[in-house]
Amino acid sequence: MNQIVLNIIIAFLWVLFQDEDHFKFSTFFSGYLIGLIVIYILHRFFSDDFYVRKIWVAIKFLGVYLYQLITSSISTINYILFKTKDMNPGLLSYETRLTSDWSITFLTILIIITPGSTVIRISQDSKKFFIHSIDVSEKEKDSLLRSIKHYEDLILEVSR
């Protein structure tokens, strides 16, 4: 977070040094790009990784989640309209590697807002999720657990 603040400060200083009559976004943007270059050159002196990398990971995460949301919505609609007799609802458990409260909460929210599944309970040690799914056949169960693991990997990548 310090890198973003520093980059914005560099951009504002750039605007001030240009001595223009009024604020121009193009000047601020060019100052921001100059700040990016400076911070990239000096990022080894910061304790965190270069912040643009985390922004890229967050964008990638959003894309993956939107894809999963759309495909699971279509799958749930398909079950409701055409496969009501074939549904096999049930519970399954998932053991997580996440440790921080915010990341566990975020994963819980991602599971809950994905159609066809919801978190019923989290164990006392916050390591195991108990999830209700619209279909717990082997194929669907594996697919759900794979997508949850993928979410978990992306959360770990963002939180590094």
From Swiss-Prot:
Note whether Cell membrane occurs among the keywords. yes
Could you tell me the superkingdom of the organism this chain comes from?
Bacteria
The cross-references to InterPro entries, in alphabetical order and at most eight, read: Cation_antiport_E (IPR002758)
Q: Where in the cell is it found?
A: Cell membrane
Q: Name one GO cellular component term.
A: plasma membrane
Q: Which GO terms describe its molecular function?
A: antiporter activity; monoatomic cation transmembrane transporter activity
- Asked whether the UniProt record includes Transmembrane among its keywords, one would answer yes
Membrane-topology annotation of the record: Multi-pass membrane protein
**Membrane spanning stretches:** 22-42, 55-75, 100-120
UniProtKB keywords? Antiport, Cell membrane, Ion transport, Membrane, Transmembrane, Transmembrane helix, Transport
Free-text function comment from the UniProt entry: Expression of the mnh2 operon in E.coli is not able to catalyze Na(+)Li(+)/H(+) antiport. It does however confer higher growth rates than the control strain at up to pH 9.5. The operon may encode an NADH-ubiquinone oxidoreductase.
| Entry similarity comment | Belongs to the CPA3 antiporters (TC 2.A.63) subunit E family.
Q: How does it assemble?
A: May form a heterooligomeric complex that consists of seven subunits: mnhA2, mnhB2, mnhC2, mnhD2, mnhE2, mnhF2 and mnhG2.
Q: What is this protein called?
A: Putative antiporter subunit mnhE2
Species name for this entry? Staphylococcus aureus
Output the lineage of the source organism: Bacteria, Bacillati, Bacillota, Bacilli, Bacillales
Q: Which gene encodes it?
A: mnhE2
